[in-house]
């Protein structure tokens, strides 16, 4: 897609429809929506390239678009962070960039186990892959539950990303994909909205952060031949049977992070696999029988307990609605359903049933082995259909087992 096509009314209007999802009750969204056609047309003109006279007298085509001021606020779960939320008009531009150009250009080189901000590769997929790695290590490596884990975390990841290094990596990727150079200029405008680091809250920041450590992912997988590795933004793990190898890798990782202008925090350590891996809100243990037990972190349970305590006083006072409580609890319940948490979730649901005077069902425990099996069958279906030169279906039924696949596969 060229820059002119990106700035066209049709593309920006589709981006506006995406940007307003889940935000139509907010004041800025309502203001834009009241005059959506006029605002989108005005935005299209602002993004257009203009002829600008340079100090030497030469005339150069330049993007003169200036992003609006962002809103800064703090979030306190799971820990205190400062979020820089862009204005709604900039959300439209960011959606146009990400949905039409940036996502495909950047994610093509990402490894399978680089999670976050990608379709089908969120926290649920990260937990499933960790469980798959632990089970596979137990069954195929022949080491049982004996082994070592390198668990790493980057200190102040988003705030520490150097703009010059990020732009250099970004330009190399976009040039390789044949992206219009003016798209890179527009992205640089959004990178420079802050003097240092990347703003939490911008849609592009998530992809930029993943791309910034994409080279690191490939080094771990290709240079060190590590099979059991996963990363979610700044949080990563490596499972290996050789402690000395992990010590060498850790030394090299520190040097590599230093070259990126980053630093591993104090939580980075090498420890026995039997201790379990703290990843994506769960503590995952590998037992002597090869089973993986995933327990919800204590702070997540405590936060929900405190929320319920607040709701028990705020709901009768009219400070929070029934719908808001149900949506918040349902989201937490869906996440907690990955672990051994049935009794805990049922206990919290019972308290809310007394408060709201309604029946609250809880999610069934999510079986990550079944999810992995269904995905494997879907891949097998696609391979068979390709060989038979048949049209691919966008969705594959979970119960469909094509001819040629053994019953126990």
Indicate residue ranges for each PLM-predicted region:
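Short, conserved aromatic-histidine micro-motifs
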Residues: 50-56, 226-233, 303-316
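A common structural junction motif
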Residues: 254-262
């Amino acid at each position: 897609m060229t820059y002119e096509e990106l700035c066209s009314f049709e593309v920006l209007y589709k981006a506006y429809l995406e940007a307003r999802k889940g935000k139509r009750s907010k004041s800025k969204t309502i203001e834009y929506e009241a005059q959506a056609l006029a605002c989108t047309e005005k935005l299209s003109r602002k993004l257009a390239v203009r002829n600008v006279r340079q100090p030497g007298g030469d005339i150069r085509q330049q993007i003169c678009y200036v992003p609006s001021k962002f809103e800064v606020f703090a979030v306190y779960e799971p820990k205190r962070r400062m979020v820089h939320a862009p204005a709604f008009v900039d959300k439209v531009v960011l959606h146009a960039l990400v949905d039409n150009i940036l996502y495909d250009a950047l994610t093509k080189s990402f490894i399978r186990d680089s999670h976050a901000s990608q379709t089908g590769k969120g926290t649920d997929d990260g937990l499933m892959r960790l469980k798959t790695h632990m089970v596979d290590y137990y069954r195929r490596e022949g080491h049982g539950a004996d082994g070592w884990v390198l668990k790493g975390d980057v200190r102040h990841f988003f705030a520490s990303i150097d703009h010059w290094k990020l732009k250099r990596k970004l330009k190399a990727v976009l040039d390789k994909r044949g992206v219009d150079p003016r798209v890179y200029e527009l992205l640089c405008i959004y990178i420079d909205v802050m003097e240092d680091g990347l703003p939490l809250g911008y849609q592009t920041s998530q992809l930029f952060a993943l791309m910034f450590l994409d080279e690191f992912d490939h080094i771990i997988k290709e240079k060190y031949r590590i099979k059991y590795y996963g990363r979610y933004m700044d949080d990563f793990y490596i499972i290996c049977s050789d402690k000395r190898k992990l010590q060498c890798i850790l030394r090299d990782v520190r040097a590599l992070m230093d070259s990126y202008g980053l630093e591993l925090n104090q939580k980075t350590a090498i420890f026995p696999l039997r201790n379990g891996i703290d990843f994506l809100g769960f503590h995952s243990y590998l037992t002597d029988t090869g089973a993986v037990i995933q327990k919800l972190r204590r702070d997540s349970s405590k936060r929900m307990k405190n929320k319920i305590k607040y709701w028990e006083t705020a709901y009768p006072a009219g400070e929070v609605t029934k719908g808001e409580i149900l949506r918040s609890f349902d989201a937490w319940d869906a996440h907690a359903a990955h672990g051994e948490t049935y009794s805990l979730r049922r206990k919290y649901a019972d308290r809310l049933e007394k408060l709201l005077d309604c029946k609250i069902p809880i999610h069934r425990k999510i079986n990550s082995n079944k999810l992995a099996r269904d995905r494997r069958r879907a891949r097998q279906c696609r391979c068979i259909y390709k060989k038979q030169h048949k049209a691919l279906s966008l969705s594959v039924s979970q119960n469909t087992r094509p001819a040629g696949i053994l019953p126990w596969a």
